[in-house]
């Protein structure tokens, strides 16, 4: 599955939105990938996550003990990808603004892959890596359905992206006039 195949799934689901969006990262963009419109369809989710699992396996990372998803956005793709990798899925969630592994006991030395939905700046993955390191868990790679940065985001580890789709993103004080003229909407989930 290549980038065009992935974007075709997003288009079928009506998940490529145009307007003025405040991304989870705080950056502004004329395009928003509303993955919830994809993930509400089990068949589309399975297709994408199976392909992502195959790409992870092809990366020859050695044994993987768990898949870790950052809540909220990474929950569905991490679970579905773990199903295809045939390993357990766990997640981190924010507690006082910091990712914590609250509901699971993952042994020290376990080898994990972090699976995220969309990467823009890589912050959620970096924060998940910090959490794993604090617990003595080895992050062997991160993976995502779409890398909006087209490989430019620093995620702190090897990033395996099913698709790279570079979309412009701007700081709020550096918007092009045509974007600034459109009222901004904030559809992300970081502060939930």
Curated annotation (Swiss-Prot):
A Pfam family of this chain: Pribosyltran
Cofactor field: Mg(2+)
Gene3D superfamilies from the UniProt entry: 3.40.50.2020
Enzyme class: transferase
CDD domains: PRTases_typeI (cd06223)
A GO BP entry: 'de novo' UMP biosynthetic process
EC code: 2.4.2.10
Pathway membership, UniProt: Pyrimidine metabolism; UMP biosynthesis via de novo pathway; UMP from orotate: step 1/2
Superkingdom, taxonomy of origin: Bacteria
Residues holding orotate: 120, 148
One function term, GO molecular function aspect: magnesium ion binding
Keywords assigned: Glycosyltransferase, Magnesium, Pyrimidine biosynthesis, Transferase
Coiled coil segments of this chain: none
Reaction(s) catalysed (UniProt annotation): orotidine 5'-phosphate + diphosphate = orotate + 5-phospho-alpha-D-ribose 1-diphosphate
Binding site residues for 5-phospho-alpha-D-ribose 1-diphosphate: 116-124
Role according to the record: Catalyzes the transfer of a ribosyl phosphate group from 5-phosphoribose 1-diphosphate to orotate, leading to the formation of orotidine monophosphate (OMP).
Entry similarity comment: Belongs to the purine/pyrimidine phosphoribosyltransferase family. PyrE subfamily.
NCBIfam families: pyrE_Therm (TIGR01367)
Subunit comment: Homodimer.
Protein name per Swiss-Prot or TrEMBL: Orotate phosphoribosyltransferase
